[in-house]
């Protein structure tokens, strides 16, 4: 499967990622490479392999719980289709 530039633009729009036309072909190549890897995975013979629900015995490494301000408010809000001050603006869904 190969993605054309129009599909890459649509994926970027749905993901709310702003891309320049100059970056479009590079992104198209990266996405096509990822899809190529997925196609390779589909060719792997998995007959007789039990499905894995989870790792079961894996544990997450504990870290100290530290409160931060995030320091990325402006970067996050730059992806919002509409904002009012430091908040996302969304359409009213409940009357």
UniProtKB/Swiss-Prot annotation:
Family affiliation: Belongs to the GatC family.
Family matches, as SUPFAM superfamilies: Glu-tRNAGln amidotransferase C subunit
Reaction equation(s) it catalyzes: L-glutamyl-tRNA(Gln) + L-glutamine + ATP + H2O = L-glutaminyl-tRNA(Gln) + L-glutamate + ADP + phosphate + H(+); L-aspartyl-tRNA(Asn) + L-glutamine + ATP + H2O = L-asparaginyl-tRNA(Asn) + L-glutamate + ADP + phosphate + 2 H(+)
Subunit structure, interactors included: Heterotrimer of A, B and C subunits.
Keywords for this protein: ATP-binding, Ligase, Nucleotide-binding, Protein biosynthesis
Protein name: Aspartyl/glutamyl-tRNA(Asn/Gln) amidotransferase subunit C
Role, per record: Allows the formation of correctly charged Asn-tRNA(Asn) or Gln-tRNA(Gln) through the transamidation of misacylated Asp-tRNA(Asn) or Glu-tRNA(Gln) in organisms which lack either or both of asparaginyl-tRNA or glutaminyl-tRNA synthetases. The reaction takes place in the presence of glutamine and ATP through an activated phospho-Asp-tRNA(Asn) or phospho-Glu-tRNA(Gln).
Protein's organism: Gluconacetobacter diazotrophicus (strain ATCC 49037 / DSM 5601 / CCUG 37298 / CIP 103539 / LMG 7603 / PAl5)
Single GO term (MF): ATP binding
EC number assigned by the record: 6.3.5.-
Domain of life: Bacteria
């Amino acid at each position: 499967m190969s993605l054309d530039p129009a599909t890459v633009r649509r994926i970027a729009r749905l993901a709310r990622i702003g891309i320049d036309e100059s970056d479009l072909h590079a992104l198209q190549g990266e996405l096509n490479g990822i899809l190529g890897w997925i196609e390779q995975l589909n060719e792997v013979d998995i007959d007789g392999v039990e499905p894995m629900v989870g790792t079961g015995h894996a544990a997450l490494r504990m870290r100290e719980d530290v409160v931060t301000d995030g320091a990325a408010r402006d970067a996050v809000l730059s992806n919002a289709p509409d904002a009012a001050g430091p908040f996302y603006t969304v359409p009213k869904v409940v009357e």
